């Protein structure tokens, strides 16, 4: 079954510091299995044709902006692999920062909308190259990619987010939403930094179980190709904000 919702009208629906004590933190070595420096497809890339019935891929884009075209590419890639999804269009919130900070509210809404599904959020400028089999019988509350870059260590990347549908993730989203609002005047602050902060806090205070996604599931098309030259991406992100954030 393919789930897509389309509509009309006004709203169409179709600095984290390095912390080696954080259990999410894992330095990447060239021979580390996390880096996947292999020319052969990983087991996670092999698809037996069976879909994951309780997984819903969700995402959003701003209507009448270049992101609408990006979303069409995402939806096409989801349809190719018969991946159940709900990708919607929203009105422009007033700028790139406001639009990205909406992610916390969106995830909370999707958890309520799809109560029988775990969620896999992806930014609308991403595409799926194969079926995300990693999430079959995936056991955790939340998973994101924690990535070491030259300019920032252990950065939480929110382009791909797995969330189990439970009260812990609802609580996480509410705290994330609240922190986004508190920091909205700080234009240098990113929503994914806020998410990383809340994940760390909820691991300590709320028993949240998190995982570090493989690089192939949050694969930034150029930056991560430099880090993992032989990786075979499952979900590839094309960073449309680099050219669009000043226009939207």
Give the positions of each predicted feature.
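N-terminal anchoring/stem segment of glycosyltransferases
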Residues: 2-3, 12-117, 167, 236-244
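Catalytic core and acceptor-binding pocket of nucleotide-sugar-dependent glycosyltransferases
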Residues: 105, 170-248
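GT-A fold catalytic core of metal-dependent nucleotide-sugar glycosyltransferases
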Residues: 101-156, 160-166, 170
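A structural signal for short, well-ordered beta-strand segments and their strand-loop junctions
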Residues: 86-88, 120-123, 144, 209-214
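A structural signal for well-ordered alpha-helical scaffolds and beta->alpha junctions
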Residues: 67, 71, 100, 154, ...
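Extracellular/periplasmic catalytic domains that process cell-envelope and extracellular macromolecules
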Residues: 49-52, 137, 152-156, 226-231
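Short, solvent-exposed loop/turn segments at secondary-structure junctions
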Residues: 92-93, 126-127, 149-150, 167-168, ...
